[in-house]
Each structure stands twice: as structure tokens, then as C-alpha cells.
Amino acid sequence: MENKVIQDRLTLLRAKMQEEGIDFYMMPTADFHNSEYVNDYFKVREYFSNFTGSNGTLLVWKDGAGLWTDGRYFIQAETELEGTGVELFRMLQEGVPTIEEFLEQNMQQGQTLGFDGRVIAAMDGKKYEKVLAKAQICIAYEKDLADSIWTDRPNFPAGKVTVLDEKIAGKSVEEKLTQTREKMAKDGANALLLT
């Protein structure tokens, strides 16, 4: 049975890719902090594939699309991808290329891989650079193509920070700050960056 909604979304995405000069577009399951479970705003992969599992990467190109996921989700992915035109790539199965291998085998010199670099781990970005540089393939890191297509996209999460009670946290904010400052002074640190 065809999934016209997903097929139409992929058609819009491919048109946007062509407009932006992108030949392959990648969408992982991630947010700006590389969380495994993401807020609805970041469910871009799900929006374009119908796959709702917590782990997977969608890759779209001119005449195809593929979803890479692990063994926990093979059955779920088969069901949810049915009729979408998205092919399932079963990670770690014999004969199934990794995303890097697929890109290396299918991208040609001068082509461009695009993705929203804010949701790709730096380590993965460097891995793609290394693999694709040999073939003189460009990478466009700053492309959130979903934003112009997903018109009813949920709002970006903007909740307030919640301070946990000492019963849960074990110590007060003041105690934690004092301990941190003492450790910094002991180690000769002038600043501490927390992300």
C-alpha cells in the first residue's frame, strides 16, 4: 500500500535539494546535543520516512532514499516504511553497506552531501569529510532543509530549567558550586565550560 503523504514529502525535499545544489541529504535521529530521544521539533527523519524508532538515519538522493537502523527496529521499520519508497538498510548485517560505504560507492566527484550540522556529531562529520574528500565530494553542513517544507513543525523546545530538590540531587546548588570552584582552584582553572 502506498504512503502518499511520505512520498509527497520526499518529492518536496528532493525539489529543495535540487534548488540548494545538494545531491544527497542526511537526517539522523539527533538534536543539538546528540540525544538519543529527541523533542518533536527534531523528528525530521520521522517526518520524511514515517519511521518512529529512536535510532536511525535517513539518506535521500535524486531517485531513492534509505534508512539505516539497528536490529532492535528491523520489524518496526519494515512496517513503517512500507509504501514510502524508503529502502531499509539493516545495519551490521552481511552485505549491507554502512552509510559511509554507501556514500563512497554512490556519490560522484563534484556532488554535495548536505545535512544540518547542528545535529551531526563532530566525530561523524569528520568521518564523512575523510571518506568523501578522496572523491572530491563537497559537504554542506548548514542545511536544515526540513524547515521550509515541514510547515506545521512543532515549536523549538524552550522550557525553563528545573532545579531538582536536594532529596533528589543529593546536594544544594550552592554546595555543588562551592565544590566545583574549590576543584577549579586546586587544578589552576580560571573557567569551566559546561554543555
Kindly label every feature range from the protein language model.
Residues M1-T195:
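Terminal domain-start leader segments
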